[in-house]
Curated annotation (Swiss-Prot):
EC number of this enzyme: 3.1.-.-, 3.6.4.-
Source organism of this protein record: Clostridium perfringens (strain SM101 / Type A)
Pfam annotation, one family: MutS_V
Lineage of producing organism: Bacteria, Bacillati, Bacillota, Clostridia, Eubacteriales
Full protein name: Endonuclease MutS2
Domain Smr: from-to ranges: 711-786
Binding-site list for ATP: 332-339
InterPro entries: DNA_mismatch_repair_MutS_C, DNA_mismatch_repair_MutS_core, DNA_mismatch_repair_MutS_sf, MSSS, MutS, MutS2, P-loop_NTPase, Smr_dom
SMART domains associated with the record: MUTSac, MUTSd, SMR
HAMAP family associated with the record: MutS2 (MF_00092)
NCBIfam families, per the entry: mutS2
Keyword rRNA-binding: yes
CDD domains, sorted: ABC_MutS2 (cd03280)
Family: Belongs to the DNA mismatch repair MutS family. MutS2 subfamily.
Biological process according to GO: mismatch repair; negative regulation of DNA recombination; rescue of stalled ribosome
Length: 786
């Protein structure tokens, strides 16, 4: 596809909008490289992947991309065997975490619809729990290794804390004993060594090493001799800490290198998923649909909207071309909205052929074209000193050199910028030449000659954009089959031109021309009325179809529930009777054995006892059946309230009461997705089953496990981070967590401030603080919940 048409139809603006939904830099680059695909197979596959992603968005919400960064640079470094930075390892760890979460997110349950393309991509994801766990255990933030990264590091840092505590006690003692010689009563640190601010004139009173001085020279920063050994010990521990951190980074980098091929594959799949879901999110916000793609040159767009015009201002139109006619001429006055229709059609074609959902109703069709050409707008170059006509003709010449039967050609004001008679003749000749090649053509014009050409030429159709003479503005609704009317006289009258001048002008025009314009106006009025009638009929037809399907679904649901209830009852009754029969057979066998033993007094007693057992067993079976019937019937409701839960025995299902009893004694209830009317006296008290109680208890136990003790907000803007944190705090509070950690990173501090402001007003928060050394420092906030 030529770059000029992408620019002229503003496809680049669409890509910028889609890019805003992508997360990784690599996915954003994929969006910017997006253009129509070269084969109809590729077009259909990429549309299908976008539709699958939209289905998942609608059913499951946004995919778990939180905390994902582009790790292309880190992977490149790891491939060469280099040691990765803390930040690089953290990002790879986050990417592996996203891999695991995405694999779970995209897993299909049995009852869910199949998503062939995305499920195939999911199968390519390989979860590396060991690598992910090793990195997350060792790294706290972009610049901090956790104490628990190794036993040695833990030991070193514990010693560091002890030494720092000792030296602080020592230095405070020195400060107190030398207060008269000091510029300030506070110690400070220079070059990782504790020093005190001594007045220059008293330097001999405080023996030690001078490390620095103030800008005025009045203060010397001296390391007292008594602190030298302690400072040396701290320095040694810091060197050991640095060496251990470098060893840990090298070890983790080696682990990444060992799994680099899998990590690369995972990252490439995640980037592609990021790209696909960006398309789907844009399509969702646009209200887009997946078009039907054909190769016959047929365009059939229902309720098509220009995607760059705000929703509250855009007007939809039905646009079709390629079945009854191959060329559509949109005629009418300048500034009449014709160009918008032209751009809408071309841009929707580009979007669909690039795998994007289109702003049109379901079942709209686009055609696969090898090339789309457009001559729209006045793009002449001042440097080239080209006139409007010359500029357009230069573009048209290039189009004529390349267009074929697989091309869609768009002309804006074909033949304009020169003598009207010559321009119209040239336009007709160009259209005829392209039609002979089999091109599909849409062109705008205000020449009357082209209206006549369309009326008398086979496979060429007139169209116009409806114009409101009262407001002097186009409505932007396309009327196919009706040529455009200039409205020059009526517009002039509305603007205040005197009637006598208008009447004189009409005398100049031939009677045939005036009659033709009047005929056009009549056609427009009839076309608008017919279109409005057709729309109303379509709405009524759709409503009727919805009601038909809704009641059919209700009937099938009731039939299914009733059959299931009967089947369950028969099955349970059979189980009870089978059990009773089995035990009765055993008792009868025992009785026959006793009879064979003879009729001794002892045998008679045993025989009578077995008969008693048989009677008891049969009575018990009958009682159980009766009890089951009573249970199914349930306790009658004494009072009916709207919103209460009740049992409807006829379908053996719990329902929600939606209305009070009417004069017939009926109430409306909701059973699942159905709303039905039943007798109030048929409702029973709904009791919670043992199984439901078990499920609730099990869910309560699982809640705590399902909410992580921390959440990563890095990479989000303030608004998204506050929203995500707010939802997480709600979940953590419900799950019973007492303390959680919000990871926001250090950065510029903007995100940290926004989170802090949100926490001050949050109803579940008891208190909060910044993390301490080893917890993530100022890169995290620890929250205590109420």
């Amino acid at each position: 596809m030529n770059d000029r048409v992408l620019r002229v139809l503003e496809f680049n603006k669409i890509k910028e909008l889609v890019k805003g939904y992508a997360i990784t830099k690599s996915a954003k680059e994929m969006v910017l490289d997006l253009k129509p695909y070269d084969s109809v197979y590729d077009v259909k596959e990429h549309l299908e992947e976008t539709k699958e992603a939209l289905d998942i968005l609608m059913r499951k919400g946004n995919p778990p991309f939180e905390g994902l960064y582009d790790v292309k640079e880190a992977i490149t470094r790891a491939e060469k065997g280099g040691v990765l930075s803390i930040e690089g390892l953290l990002r790879i760890g986050n990417m592996l975490s996203v891999t695991r979460k995405l694999s779970d997110f995209l897993a299909r349950k049995e009852e869910e619809e199949e998503h062939r393309i995305l499920e195939g991509m999911r199968e390519g994801l390989i979860v590396l729990r060991g690598v992910e766990s090793a990195i997350s255990k060792a790294i706290v933030s972009e610049d901090e290794i956790a104490d628990s990264a190794s036993d040695k590091l833990y030991s070193i840092r514990r010693s560091l804390k002890e030494k720092n505590s000792s030296i602080r006690d020592k230095v405070n003692s020195i400060v107190r004993s030398n207060a008269q010689y000091l510029q300030d009563s506070l110690y400070t640190v220079r070059g990782d060594r504790y020093v005190i601010p001594v007045k220059a004139e008293y330097k001999s009173q405080v023996p030690g090493l001078v490390h620095d001085q103030s800008s005025t020279g009045a203060t010397l920063f001296i390391e007292p001799t008594a602190l030298v050994n302690l400072n040396n010990e701290i320095k040694e521990l810091m060197l050991k800490e640095r060496a251990e951190i470098e060893r840990i980074l090298a070890e983790l980098s080696a682990l990444v290198y060992k799994n680099i091929d899998v990590i690369k594959v995972n990252f490439n799949i995640i980037v592609e998923l990021d790209f696909i879901f960006a398309k789907a999110k844009y399509g969702s916000d646009l209200g887009g649909t997946m078009p039907i793609v054909n190769e016959e040159g047929v365009i059939d767009l229902m309720d098509a909207r220009h995607p760059l015009i705000p929703k509250d201002k855009v007007v939809s139109s039905d646009i079709y071309l390629g079945r009854e006619f191959s060329t559509l001429l949109i005629t009418g006055p300048n500034t009449g909205g014709k160009t918008v229709t032209l751009k809408t059609t071309g841009l929707i074609e580009l979007m669909g052929l690039s795998g994007l959902l289109i702003p049109a109703s379901e079942n709209s069709s686009i055609s696969f074209f090898e090339e789309i050409f457009a001559d729209i707008g006045d793009e002449q170059s001042i440097e080239q000193s080209l006139s409007t006509f010359s500029s357009h003709m230069t573009n048209i010449v290039k189009i004529m050199e390349k267009a074929n039967n697989k091309s869609f050609v768009l002309f804006d004001e074909l033949g304009a910028g020169t003598d009207p008679t010559e321009g119209a003749a040239l336009a007709i000749s160009i259209l005829e030449n392209l039609r002979a090649r089999g091109c599909r053509i849409m062109s705008t014009t205000h020449y009357s000659e082209l209206k006549g050409y369309a009326l008398k030429t086979e496979n060429v159709e007139n169209a116009s954009v409806e114009f409101n003479v009262e407001t002097l503005r186009p409505t932007y609704r396309l009327l196919i089959g009706v040529p455009g009317k200039s409205n020059a006289f009526e517009i002039s009258r509305r603007l205040g031109l005197k009637d006598n001048i208008i009447e004189e002008a009409k005398k100049v025009i031939s009677t045939e021309s005036l009659q033709f314009e009047d005929l056009i106006q009549s056609l427009q009025e009839k076309s608008i009325k017919a279109e409005n009638d057709a729309r109303e009929a379509a709405i009524l037809r759709n409503d009727a179809e919805k009601y038909k399907n809704r009641y059919k679904e209700k009937f099938e649901r009731i039939e299914s529930v009733r059959d299931n209830v009967y089947a369950d009852a028969r099955r349970e009754a059979k189980q009870i009777l089978d059990s009773a029969k089995e035990e009765a057979d055993t008792i009868l066998k025992n009785m026959r054995d006793l009879e064979r033993m003879g009729i001794s007094s002892d045998a008679r007693r045993k025989l009578e006892a077995e008969r008693g057992k048989l009677r008891d067993k049969i009575s018990d079976a009958e009682a159980r059946l009766q009890k089951k019937k009573e249970e199914q019937k349930g306790e009658e409701l004494k009072k009916i309230e709207v919103g209460m839960e009740a049992l409807l025995p006829s379908i053996n299902q719990k329902v929600i009461v939606l209305s009070k009893p009417d004069n017939k004694g009926e109430v409306q209830v909701q059973a699942g997705i159905m709303k039905i009317n039943v007798k109030a006296k048929d409702l029973r008290v709904a009791k919670e089953t043992k199984e439901e109680k078990k499920i609730k208890k099990r869910e309560a136990r699982l809640n705590l496990r399902q909410v992580d003790p921390s959440i990563d907000l890095r990479g989000m803007d303030s608004e998204e981070a506050c929203y995500t944190a707010d939802k997480y705090l709600d979940d953590a509070y419900v799950a019973g967590r007492g303390e959680v950690t919000l990871v926001h990173g250090k950065g510029t501090g903007v995100l940290r401030k926004a989170i802090n402001d949100m926490l001050k007003k949050h109803p579940h928060v008891k208190s909060h603080r910044l993390g301490e050394y080893g917890e993530g420092g100022t890169g995290v906030t620890v929250v205590i919940l109420k």
